[in-house]
Amino acid sequence: MVWKPLAHTAACLAGAFLLGGLIGFERQFRHRLAGLRTNTLVAVGAATFVVFSSLVSGDSSPTRVAAQIVSGIGFLGAGIIFKEGFNVRGLNTAATLWCSAAVGVLCGAGLISHAAVATVFIIAVNALLRPLVQVLEFQAMRRGAFQPTYAIDIICHGDAEAQVRALLLRDIGDHLHIHELESSNIEGTNRVEVSATVRADQRQDRLLEQIVGHLSLEPRITSARWRIEDDSGGLSGL
């Protein structure tokens, strides 16, 4: 009597191990944060919780356990997602972990064939759609959608830092995409340098000149200039 449920558990966990490993192998091959071991552990862990709910009598519905697994994976995925400037990285890796948990839930419920089908689709999304994304990005660049990067440097009195940042954000508005905004004290003075890196859908030299020209009229700003980041000979405004 003991061997039958034990064999069922072993089969479920083995399925989660193999399928989670397949998903993780693709991630490991591309050197992602969550690779072979992480995706395999997520799948096996999710399967274990579902198997446990089916073995214990009482108020332990597998569907309820699956809902709790989804919540738990959310916390794990949040640790992988991070911001780099104004860019968010790790979203695809976190989504893959979420899918690995779903595969584990299916395996834990004994639906290994269904889990195998889901695994095929998950790997296909990560592997086959990547070239399509690259083609779309290349086509966008050919259409002139390359985004030039501009740097704006402003020096102001220390007590005007917050005002300058607010004015800069207001003038940028929806015309440019902010990539980075930071402030630093200039040693030995009461001045602060506010630096911003922005991107545009196309060359916006005239707009940058207008923004910097408007800011230079502020009495608490002592210097304002802009330049094109990827062009050492780019224009600058005082």
UniProtKB/Swiss-Prot annotation:
The answer to keyword Transmembrane helix applying to this record is: yes
Q: Record's Gene Ontology CC terms? A: plasma membrane
Q: Where in the cell is it found?
A: Cell inner membrane
Identify the keywords attached in UniProt to this record, alphabetized: Cell inner membrane, Cell membrane, Membrane, Transmembrane, Transmembrane helix, Virulence
Annotated transmembrane regions: 5-25, 38-58, 66-86, 105-125
* Function noted in UniProt: Virulence factor required for growth in low Mg(2+) medium and for intramacrophage survival. May be involved in regulating membrane potential by activating Na(+)/K(+)-ATPase.
Q: What is this protein called?
A: Protein MgtC
State the annotated membrane topology for this chain.
Multi-pass membrane protein
What family does the database annotate? Belongs to the MgtC/SapB family.
